[in-house]
A protein has these predicted regions:
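Beta1/beta-strand and adjacent pyrophosphate-binding region of the FAD-binding site
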Residues: 1-11
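N-terminal Rossmann-fold NAD(P) dinucleotide-binding loop
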Residues: 14
Length: 154
């Protein structure tokens, strides 16, 4: 299939680029190997902020008496905290899915690999390979930490 733009990765950089390009009239495809939104939205930044907000609310409850409010026995419900965190991430991922549909963006599930000039090979979960072509390609695959010699990771 041929597109004006292929975006590899649907994290914060990828999904914004895809949506804007579509709004400007381009035929856009996004290649994503996992959930829409990438690591930040699904497992990193957003769920972490949700967990921190729960901790903040518990902290506020612990100091409520300082503000003239009585709260007895405020305690965390870790299952509910985790469920809320996952719910927030899932809702935001579904929001990206909605925006992609609204903007006619094709989602291709699989691992993208640049193979030739203006071509991306995608391997899906079953191991099937397809080749897609675009005039422009944006690599928005995020990053991973790297172990450096003599510097232990913590």
């Amino acid at each position: 299939m041929k597109y004006d733009l292929i975006v590899v990765g649907s994290g914060p950089g990828g999904y914004v680029a895809a949506i804007r390009a579509s709004q400007l009239g381009m035929n856009v495809a996004v290649i994503e190997r996992a959930e829409l939104g990438g690591i930040c939205l699904n497992w990193g930044c957003i769920p972490t902020k949700s967990l921190l907000k729960s901790a903040q609310v518990l902290e506020y409850a612990g100091h409520a008496a300082d503000y003239g409010v009585k709260i007895e026995h405020a305690e965390p419900d870790f299952d509910a905290i985790i469920a809320r965190s996952r719910g927030v991430a899932d809702k935001m991922s579904k929001g990206i899915q909605y925006l992609f549909k609204k903007n006619n963006i094709t989602v291709i599930e699989g691992h993208g690999k640049l193979t030739a000039d203006k071509k991306v090979e995608v391997t899906d979960a079953a191991g099937e390979k397809t080749v897609h072509e675009a005039q422009h390609i944006v690599l928005a695959t995020g990053a991973r930490s790297r172990q450096l010699p003599n510097i232990p990771q913590d």
